[in-house]
A protein has these predicted regions:
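Short, acidic, Ser/Thr-enriched surface-loop or helix-capping motifs
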Residues: 4-5
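Flexible mid-to-C-terminal extensions adjoining Fe-S/redox cofactors in radical SAM and related proteins
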Residues: 15-112
Length: 112
């Protein structure tokens, strides 16, 4: 999965506006091989509960480090912000969702 914004930046998700590659400058395959996407592959799964898959919403401690290691930059065309600032807004949600997700995951017979 990926998202290409109006400026041609290839992002890992429509909600995660960070990239290190632009479709107008590189082939699609090169864009998929950008360091940020490689960081995604290295990090997945971001925890043992697949009901919490996102490195921003459910694992907000992950995305800022991934963006930093990849040397990616903000591609938000309206309001650029650091990955740290974005993810700071997600910690409360992640903390509330984690126990519910773990309960549901356990009910399906998975280890928590």
């Amino acid at each position: 999965y990926c998202h290409i914004n109006a400026a041609g930046d290839v992002e890992p998700c429509v909600f995660i506006h960070y990239s290190g590659a632009n479709i107008r400058e590189k082939s699609f395959l090169e864009c998929l091989r950008q360091p940020l996407f490689l960081e995604y592959r290295k990090g997945q799964p971001f925890n043992d509960n697949l009901l919490r898959p996102c490195p921003m919403l459910e694992n907000p401690e992950c995305l800022p480090e991934m963006v930093k290691r990849a040397g990616a930059h903000s591609t938000d065309l309206e309001a650029p912000e650091s990955a740290e600032h974005l993810c700071d807004k997600c910690h409360a949600y992640a903390a509330c969702w984690k126990p519910e997700a773990e309960k549901l995951w356990a009910e399906e017979g998975h280890e928590v």
